[in-house]
Structures are given as C-alpha cells and as structure tokens.
Amino acid sequence: IRDSCYPMWYNGHGIDIGRLHRGYWLPVKPGWYYGCGEYGAEGLDSAEVMEERYPREWLREPFDPGRIVRSQTKSFSGFFYDAQEDMQGWISRSQRYQAFATRMMTEAFRRDDRMVSNAIHLFIDAWPSGWMKSIMDCKRIPKQAYFAYRDALAPLLVSLRTDRFAYTAGETIQIEAFLCNDTAKSGAYTLAFELYNEQNKLIQTGRVPAHADACRAAYIASAEFPAETAQDRETLTLRAVLLDGNGDVVNDTEQKLTVFQDVTVVPNDDVVILKLEPGLHTVAGETVTVKPCGMLPLHFVSRKTAHPAVAEFKEQDFSYWYNAKEDCITPLLDTTFTVEGFTPILLSNNMDEQGNWGPVLAAAEKLYEGKHYVICQLELRQENPVAKRFLRNLYRLGTK
C-alpha cells in the first residue's frame, strides 16, 4: 500500500502527527507491509537563488513570502511557527521547520517495522520557486532538511522518541530508544545514554546492551531519569550513542527537553475565562465569531503578541503538547475566533470568507465592567507545564 502523507504541512493530512509519532499509520490490513509515497514540508529557497533568479517584485520590501509564485509558506506557516520580519528571517525559519518536520516524520517511518518504503518529495528542485518542499534547491544548495534527512537515513540508526518535550521538576522523564537497521547484517552493540544540563555538563550516564536484527526496527530500552533543575526552566539534552564491540561510535543522536519548576494556579473572580463553541457569541459587549480550524486541529499557536501573559514563553512552548488521557501528542487547538475590541494573547491561522488564509485569534482578553474577560480556545491540559503557567498568568491579569 502506497500513500502520500503531509501531516506537518497540509496539517493533519493522512494522519495526525501525534499518532504518526506514536507509531500509528493509516488503516492497513493485518499483516500487510506498506510504504509512504510522498511526504515533506516547505522550506524557502536560499537567498542566493532568490536574488539571482526571482523577479524583483517578489523581493521588494517589506518582504512577503506570499508574493512568491507557488509558495505556500505565507498561507500555512501560521500552523507551525511565528511570522517573520524579513527575507532572511523567513528563509531561516522555514528551513529550520522543514528540517524539524523531515526528521520527525522520517524517524517515525524508520521506527515502523512494517514501513518498507518512503520517499520525501522532492530531493532536488528543478526550477527556482518550483517545488519548495524540495530539500535541495535548483542550484544544488542543500537546505537544512537535507542534512536532517541524511542523518535520519543512516543504515544503522538510533532513534529517540518521546511524547513529552516538557516536564515539571520532580517528574520522571522517560525517553524510548529504538534501533533501526536497514542493513542485512545482525549484530550486538551497546547503547550509551548521556544526559547534559544547559551548561553542557554531563550529569548522568547509563548503558544497555542492544542487538540489531537484520532489516528490522525494534525498541531497545527507555532512558529514565528525574526531571531536576535549579532554574525556573532549563533545557536538558539526552544523547544516545551506539557503540560496537570495540567501543567505536556507530551512530548517535540527541533529544532536547525542557524542565520547568512547578507553579500554583490561583483562581481569580475578577478573571472570566471562556472557551466558546463554534458560532456567534456576545462577550464583554463584543460580537465573537468562532469557527473550526480550517485545516484540522492544530499543534501550534503563536505567542508573538507582546502580551504580558505570554512574555515568559519561547516560540515553540505552545506546540506539540502531551495528552495524558491519550498517552500521546494531540492537537491543542480545534477552533479560532475573530472579535473587535479584544487584546490578542495567542494567534493562529484560518481561512476568511474570501478563501484566504490569514491571522486569527486563539486567545484574547478585554477589561469590561471591572473584570478581565479572556476567550481561550486552547486545550489547557495541565500535565503540560506551559499550559499550567499560562493559566496562572491569565488569572494574574485580574491582580490589582
């Protein structure tokens, strides 16, 4: 069975990325093997290609990727990352996202023992602004995704997998390790784990035996360690190194995680937090229009609003949240809204009445008759430390 699958560009296409990352695939008969005929995400051409080959009109200031013929970055980037300020910012951010999506999907396919074939679309572009999901442009300049793809296709690959990219201090972190062997040789190896703190200091190690069966992918072990930090938030890096019988490195990889100190959420009667159903509503004297996300529920919202409730957060904090009930990553937003008179807190992307994609609201607030009215369409699952901190910050809006 062959099929295309673009959940990290045509959001949710084929299968939600949380389920793909967890190990699921499209419906297939029991015992059948399968392949993925196409997948990928868009990354803009290099500045060199743009400046040499693009019409000047496409590049005039202020730079707008929507002027690039056949590019979908302007329309769809709001599903995945913040809007950028200039040409170099758009190139860098789009290519960085493309690399992230390429690694996430390719490694999911490598871990799937029944996935026998897959093809990124495309490897090399034929034209300027041709097919920007290509991982190398028409001048043979590799995008960041080229290197992510190369690394994910190592014949003998160590792949780390987690459904949680953020933890609260005191929890136990569990990261699964898989050994993906595309060679015809079996062998015995050792898998070494190394945990580093934000200052790149080695703080914990561990080793387990790892056997690679020929032409197979298999779970090996989970690295378990306490989520500890003396800071308010800290990025930890787990490195996994595959060693042969001589102690030489065969393959290695790493996964970054963020550990947050716990916070206390104190409800405030002066703050009214609402999550609205699709339709028309009147809130704080304003008409609110709520509609479903136009390209399936989303895994990202932008905090690029300068609102004090999101000042402490980083770009990707509001993305790929864990769902304890489902035990996997699930979307955090299934509806957006538009309203006048409210101050934006979180932004998303949706289609307007003319069929154009553009910015809309995921959360916004208004002070009205002595109370702060907050419309928040996110699923604020409290097992996610960012969701808990955000809820705390919303209630603090009413603190005099």
Could you describe each region identified by the protein language model?
Residues 170-211, 218-224, 232-245:
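Beta-strand-rich binding/interaction modules
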Residues 258, 262-291, 374-376, 394:
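Structured N-terminal alpha/beta-domain signature
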